[in-house]
Amino acid sequence: MRCGNNLKQIGLGQLNYEGVYGKFPAGNRFGTSAALDRPGGLVDILPFVEMESLFKLYDLNAPPNAQVFPGTTKLLGSTVVQTYICPSDTDPATNSTNGMAKSNYVASGGSGAQINNPNCSCTSANFNTYALGPYDPSATANPNGVYSRRGYQARIADITDGLSNTILFGETRPSCSNHANSGWGAANGGQGLASTIYPINFFSCNNADTDGCKRPCNWSTELGFKSMHVGGANFLFGDGAVRFLTESVDHTMFQRLGAKADGQAVTLP
């Protein structure tokens, strides 16, 4: 239950932020260079998940990787935020390489591919063309999902498919993703986002696998929703509800749940 409760807290943070500012936080703020990256959506909602003291230390006009505690060299993003961690994930809470604290929860970029995929060729499926949505990894105006990596901020009015039919957030496994393992404070590329293109719990955790689809360096499959729960993963919907979707969910419907305004009817199991 705690994993679902964490997502509910994130949902309250998203909806309360929208209530104050009239739009949801950006999924990410990936600049045209590292110097122009800015903290993403999980930073924005810190005041709404009882972490206002940490939020006040952030400079929202500076790159995430430049953020340090005053007088130290410790990254603010190395602070473990328990609300952002699923207790079922037994991997370390921080990345041993960069020291950043993980998040098991990422925003939905919709049913379009999130990022170019130059690494780890996929032999079992071409997931970059599997989506109902467009390939639009840098969308700034009106992306397929509620969030994008380029600073787009959706309004409730933009979610014309209905809040109860649209995924806001879901689970990820940072150890299975070369982007998600950069932590909740990162903002580069696909960090902080996932797509409903890829089946729930599609395995991308084996660095030694000959099929690039199944490796964390595959920039497509690693950005799918996945968890340590048996048989599925938890998802936060726009109405604040948390639902467990199974791996056997109809895949076309799953993709449509990622899109905020495709006009397609869905029936949740």
Where are the model-predicted features located?
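Extracellular/periplasmic head regions of type IV pilus-like filament subunits
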Residues: 31-88, 152, 162
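Hydrophobic alpha-helical interface faces used for helix-helix packing
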Residues: 64-67, 90, 103, 108-269
